[in-house]
Structure formats: C-alpha cells, structure tokens
Amino acid sequence: MMKSFFLVVTILALTLPFLGAQEQNQEQPIRCEKDERFFSDKIAKYIPIQYVLSRYPSYGLNYYQQKPVALINNQFLPYPYYAKPAAVRSPAQILQWQVLSNTVPAKSCQAQPTTMARHPHPHLSFMAIPPKKNQDKTEIPTINTIASGEPTSTPTTEAVESTVATLEDSPEVIESPPEINTVQVTSTAV
C-alpha cells in the first residue's frame, strides 16, 4: 500500500511542472490572420533528406531485393519451377521437372473462367529408394528353424597331461624324471 502511494506521489511531483507550463501556454491566444496556419521554427525544425532516407527505408533507394526467406519448394508460394532433388537415385530415374501451367480451369457454376495460382506438388517418389533387383541371384540355403526335441552333441577330444611326482621322506636325490601320462578325454558339448 505504501509503495503504491509513494509511486503516485513521485509521478505527480514529476508531472506537475509540465502541466503548469502547458496551462500557461494555453492562456495566450494564438491569433492567425487570413486563415494562415501558425508555424513555429522552434517546434518544426528542418529535417534533412538523408535523415528521412536512413530513418524510413521505404523512401530510400532499394539496392537489394528484400524478399522473405522461404524454401524453394514451399507449397504456399507460386514458383513456376521446382529445384531438382538431391541425387538419391540414378540420373535416369530422377524425374524431369517442367514448367507447370499457372491456371486452373473454371468450375461449371461460374460464368467466366478464373485464373488462380496453382501450386504444384512434386512427386515424392524420389524419397523412397526401391529395392535393387539382382540379376545374378545366388541360392541361399534354407535353414530349418524348428527346434528338435533332442539336442545334438558335438564330440571334442582334448589331450590332458598329468604329472605324477612321488616324494619320499628320504634324503636321496631323485635322478629319474617324473612320469608323464597322456589320457584321451572325450566330452559331449551341448
């Protein structure tokens, strides 16, 4: 509440001198003779033409074309040409774009034919790439994907070496090499 009160007081304090000055100027009547307009050099100063041209660009010379940025294939702008798409297919398969007519035939209920901008849409077949047809087809073997009831086992043979060294409680040095036995082990991997 106090903030709004101080705000109002501040605004009044700033605007009262200006309001008093306007009332004093209104007390002096302006007398114009012969329907001449009152013109004061202090109020309307000379405005150079460079200021107007730089301030308002619509009056200035247009060195650049000021067009809005839009896509070439925008369906809402009446361009007679469409850009060719990026080559995602071979050049023989890319459609040839042509200049399309810009008129629409009149409807039967209208007395005279109307000319309207027609916005052609490009054929979208260039976006889909058809599957390649291979001339030399190779035979792909068919695999039976149905699981059988019994898992198949693959026999593998591994060589296992076992070293047997006999230590006795005697202080004699063993001069014979340890015995090496090779055993064939067959396992079934599932």
From Swiss-Prot:
GO MF annotation: an example: identical protein binding
Site positions (Cleavage): 126-127
Localisation: Secreted
Predominant location: secreted
Positions annotated with a glycan in the UniProt record: 142, 152-154, 157, 163, 170, 186
Signal sequence segment: 1-21
Pfam families for the chain: Casein_kappa
Assigned GO CC terms: extracellular space; Golgi apparatus; Golgi lumen
Impact upon substituting residue 157 to I: In variant B and variant B2
Tissue specificity annotation: Mammary gland specific. Secreted in milk.
Entry-annotated residues carrying Phosphothreonine: 166
Keywords, sorted A to Z: Disulfide bond, Glycoprotein, Milk protein, Phosphoprotein, Pyrrolidone carboxylic acid, Secreted, Signal
Transmembrane regions: none
PTM-bearing positions, type Pyrrolidone carboxylic acid: 22
Role: Kappa-casein stabilizes micelle formation, preventing casein precipitation in milk. Casoxins A, B and C have opioid antagonist activity. Casoxin C causes biphasic ileal contractions through the binding to the complement C3a receptors.
Further comment found in the protein's record: The sequence shown is the A variant.
UniProt-recorded name of the protein: Kappa-casein
